[in-house]
Amino acid sequence: MALLVRAALLGAALGPACAAVHFREEFTDGVNWQRRWLNSQYKPDLGKFKLTAGKFYGDPVKDKGLQTCENSKFYAISSRFKPFNNKGKTLVIQYTVKHEQKIDCGGGYIKLFSSNLDQKNMSSDSPYYIMFGPDICGSETKKVHVILNYKNKLYPIKKQIRCKVDGFTHLYTLILRSDQTYKVKIDNEMIESGNLEDDWDFLPPRKINDPTVKKPQDWDDIAQINDPNDVKPEDWDEPEHIPDTSAARSKDWNNATDGEWRHPMIKNPLYRVRAGTIFDNFLITDDEEYAEDFGYETWGETKDPEKVMNIKQTEEEKKRERAEEEKHFRERLNEKVEKKKESGKNKLRRNTVQKEEL
């Protein structure tokens, strides 16, 4: 899944030498967001978005954003803004993303396109200038993408930048400066920086392989081999089927006649694309300080209350689960008591019959 944000990086030069805000979106005006954002119609089965603050939040209005709401779907939505030219200026791209579903596999990244993008037919094949944001899939992929278009060719950053993998809202910021330096920030804290020429393969390498050198005959190309002494841990758990925790016991289920109820088994989805990601607080500007302040005014003010609400909900859920377990325990205990009583009555009847026969 990828949220594709429509951007225009070509056009008229900027005017005043002050902070320029090219795009800002907080989704605080209710349904009016639908006038500014357009779902791609490239495929009929693309997933849809809804406006919500999610299951837990710091503020019911400020934390509203676009949420993916269909599992195992691809998503594409875009918003248009006035073209601009960032030549000689800093470019700051910033937004918040929350994987409240504790995602197994899916992207939370955005893309910036040219002004000639066909929004209705936008797809993964649509050319773009910049791709930025987190991408998660299983235990192997938990990284922040920074892909830049240079001379119509896409170049990913060579460094590995780890993204946040919890279920809370996080602020992602990309800063590209005119002096060829960059910064990547998460939650307004710098996690990576450097020089564009060093960390992307835009230019030919300064050194190349010597074509006259030949590989020795006894050269071993295998960098790693399987450890023959390694064995799978005894507690390794990767069953083919797992309980369906979303299933509920029917009201007419009777443990005495139907047996103890258990969750039905389903195939184990090791890495499945789950919906629930929320995108919010988009900002494109040329001012680093403005972006940092905007981040604190939005994400910064609601991040702590969001965690408090989540903790409260978790505690309440645990109480409900304990109450349900106690209820089932009492039901099973009562059933056993009733069975013993019935068994005692049957034994008494047999003894009475035997005495009468004597």
Where on the chain are the PLM-derived regions?
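Extracellular carbohydrate recognition
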Residues: 183, 271-279
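Localized edge beta-strand/strand-to-loop motifs within extracellular or lumenal beta-rich domains
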Residues: 168-183, 187
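Short, solvent-exposed beta-strand-to-loop segments that form ligand-recognition rims
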Residues: 189-270
